[in-house]
Swiss-Prot record:
Pfam family, any one: ABC_tran
Protein name: Taurine import ATP-binding protein TauB
Function field: Part of the ABC transporter complex TauABC involved in taurine import. Responsible for energy coupling to the transport system.
Keywords: ATP-binding, Cell inner membrane, Cell membrane, Membrane, Nucleotide-binding, Translocase, Transport
Gene that this polypeptide is encoded by: tauB
Assigned GO CC terms: plasma membrane
The EC number(s) this enzyme carries: 7.6.2.7
Membrane association type: Peripheral membrane protein
Domain ABC transporter intervals: 4-236
Family: Belongs to the ABC transporter superfamily. Taurine importer (TC 3.A.1.17.1) family.
Organism: Ruegeria pomeroyi (strain ATCC 700808 / DSM 15171 / DSS-3)
Length: 268
């Protein structure tokens, strides 16, 4: 089966006191090639844990990850990661950061140069390619992180709240850029976010996860990502059904948060 499969994933963490925490339980889903999926849920629902398992940074207690029908173990070049903080090399300029992956694979400049230059242009970094990382704003640094990930040409891009630290205007611009690159590259993307609006705009599929243990609570199929590729995102928010779905999800997550607080108070 082509695409990314998450097969019956469970994750339990052992604690120093001898007890354990069930972070995820029986999570299964399949993403077709080129799908854009956003993942929402209250704190502690296992969103980042799930992403780290897909990336290969964590081995699940049960279940497995498969790419195109083959089980995968540990990180590899098929899956690229974009973090909330860019994790960039401060001592390199923008172009050297973006071309780092191809260079580490032993490619010559003649092999990767045109691809890297295209990524710099499409992400708006062409005029900044010789700049040091510390000279860039947070939004520009995230552009570098995204371009660096794409330079490795992964099949799947995993994004862990990559826009969470940005101001509102920069965040909106970056959301538009993510949609543009998704359509241009045809990559499969999983995006973790705490923002309901962002999840609606950047997810043709949207998963809401529930906590303790982390599991899939509800799934939505949405039109807004496709609409946003060629439209102002502020106009997309005025689309039929957008506000109703937004309020439904907000209420759902609010109820989960209330339940968590109730459990915590009862345990004290």
């Amino acid at each position: 089966m082509s695409g990314l499969s998450i097969e019956n994933i469970s994750m339990r963490f052992d604690l120093p006191n001898g007890s354990s925490v069930q972070a995820l339980k029986n999570v299964s889903l399949h993403l077709k090639e080129g799908e854009l999926m956003s993942v929402l849920g209250p704190s502690g629902c296992g969103k980042t844990t799930l992403l780290n398992i897909v990336a290969g940074f964590l081995a699940p207690t049960e279940g497995h990850i498969a790419m195109n029908g083959h089980k995968v173990h540990g990180p590899n070049a098929e899956r690229g990661m974009v973090f909330q903080q860019g994790a960039l090399f401060e001592w390199m300029n923008v172009r050297d950061n973006v071309s780092f992956g191809p260079r580490m694979k032993g490619q010559r400049a003649s092999q990767y140069g045109s691809h890297v230059d295209h990524l710099l242009d499409v992400t708006g970094l062409g005029d900044f390619k010789d700049k040091a990382i510390y000279e860039l704003s947070g939004g520009m640094q995230q552009r570098v992180a995204l371009a660096r990930c794409l330079a490795n040409d992964p099949d799947v891009i995993l994004m862990d709240e990559p826009l969470g630290a940005l101001d509102a205007l920069t965040r909106e611009k970056m959301q538009g850029l993510v949609l543009k690159l998704w359509k241009e590259t045809g990559k499969t993307i999983i995006l973790i976010t705490h923002s309901v609006e962002e999840a609606l705009l950047l997810g043709e599929r949207l998963l809401v996860m529930a906590p303790r243990p982390g599991r899939i609570h509800k799934e939505y199929r949405l039109p807004y990502a496709d609409m946003g590729v060629n439209a102002d995102l502020r106009e997309v928010k005025k689309s039929e059904g957008y506000s109703q779905t937004r309020e439904e999800i907000l209420s759902m997550i609010w109820d989960m948060e209330e339940e968590i607080m109730g459990r915590t108070e009862a345990a004290q």
